[in-house]
Amino acid sequence: MYKRPGFCEKPDAARGQRAVGHLTATVAALLATVGQADTPMEPRFAPVPVPHHVYDGGWEHFVGGGLAVLDCDGDTRPDLVAAGGSNPPILLRNTSDVGRPITFVDATPPALDLTATTGAYPFDANNDGHLDLMILRVGPDVLLHGKGDCTFAPAPLDTGDHWSTAFSATWEAGQSEPTFAIGHYVDRADPEGPFEACDTNSLWRPTPMGHAETVLEPGHCALSILFTDWARNGRPDLRMSNDRHYYIRDGQEQLWAMEATPRLYTQDDGWARHTLWGMGIATRDLDRDGRDEVYLSSMGDQRLMEQQGDGPAYKDVPFARGTAAQRPYIGDDGRPSTGWHIAFGDVQNNGRDDAFIAKGNVQQMPGNAMEDPNNLLIGMADGSFAERGDVAGVASMHRSRGAALVDLNGDGLLDLAVVNRRAPLEVWQNVTANPGTWLSVALTQPRTNTQAVGAWIEVDDGTAIQAREVTVGGGHAGGVAGPQHFGLGTAQTVKLRIRWPHGDWTDWQTVPTNQNLSLTRP
């Protein structure tokens, strides 16, 4: 995916001068004029000033740069933790008032005084109701137990010395403790590397004595992994997206069946070989058929894939759907794009999912675009997608990496945060005029798996059913723990039901829209 270490890295001071984060318009001014937008529901975002933070470092930090979103102090406002690479991570505590301009303060605790970090994923690892952080590193990873006040304490976990770039977690049937997996990139100890020197990956399952490691091999330089119940049979399997730049010939995308002894799905199961410069995984039921499409970021074409039949067979959607996003859509750099984090979400609340793709050159790869703006692909009524990144104001030219679409100020609109390599972290507030209705659904369970990882939520607005799985993992080096957001168009009420982890469906219940709904498993 990039050159060997040691090639020339040019200064980065001038990069991103046209970036949206440098616009002088304030959020407050845009909020005051938002009703005057030319086109109803045309997406609009305004840059938000935030404490300075940069993801930096040499060759080992060309990848990574993840962003974790979690409510670390129980005030229902999403806080941010951004990996720093050679810099320490930062924790931005959300101080926003509902419906007002987004504000953050730097509240980085001593436990995050770490270097060589590549990513961060939030989940409740010890079932105490406080969200924890898995910090991925070039070196030993660190699990931090949350204390409920945005401070953390290191947990006793030894995952070895690897170049960690991906993470996912789930709760398997009959288990009170989580199963988690860590994806590793190049084996730095291989003297023949870095090419054709991909490290193995690790699966950690609970035992009476803690967790035991199962080595998942072959490894193909994973940059994103995700436990997902793709078959909707109650068992999450482990998808891996891998970087062909380093596995060269013999690798491919992978899907591990989480049986007593994990095994790879093969052609005999219907699995088809796919190769790409896999950077990130996102899943969403875009066509409302009850099955998730899979969106994989890469160099050149981004790959949106649909399941074929009941098995693990996937094929690319037609190019005409508008999801390839293979080249910059503004500027005069016609070289292929480089995609990283993909985040689905309905930014206009019109009932159709949209997709944000963080873009940016690895460092100075001459075969790929240097002026490579982020994408905001807006879902259209016919199932296609239309580019609106420039119109919306999020077409940053920085080297973007991790990202999140999440409601940061409780107004029912999804806002945007992006980590950049060798450039400041950016946050944008969604100020779209005349949006549709929405529903936010937060699930909790008592005693174990407090965030209901593995649950499915279905919301019926009378025209279609949106199905959503609660997961931990995917993306590029970071993820979101929090309520699930549904855009609902003109619906004033919807029907809702839950399939709790390893349980049955609840009855349908009718609820009003435009509210934050919290449900606890009986």
Segments and roles (model prediction):
Residues 151-153, 159-258, 262-282:
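Solenoidal tandem-repeat scaffolds enriched in leucines and small polar residues
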Residues 58-62, 110-114, 157-161, 215-220, ...:
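Surface loop/turn motifs at the tips and blade-to-blade linkers of beta-strand repeat domains
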Residues 38-45, 88-107, 140-155, 192-212, ...:
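Beta-propeller blade repeat segments, especially FG-GAP/WD-type strand-to-loop junctions
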Residues 46-58, 109-111, 267-272, 317-333, ...:
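Surface-exposed loop and turn segments in beta-propeller and other repeat-based domains
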Residues 37-38, 42, 46-57, 152-154, ...:
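Gly/Ser/Thr/Pro-enriched helix-cap/hinge segments flanking short amphipathic alpha-helices
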Residues 49-87:
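Beta-strand-rich domains and repeat architectures in extracellular enzymes and scaffolds
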Residues 77-84, 131-137, 178-185, 237-242, ...:
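Hydrophobic beta-strand segments that make up the repeating blades of beta-propeller
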Residues 64-72, 93, 117-127, 131, ...:
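Beta-propeller blade termini
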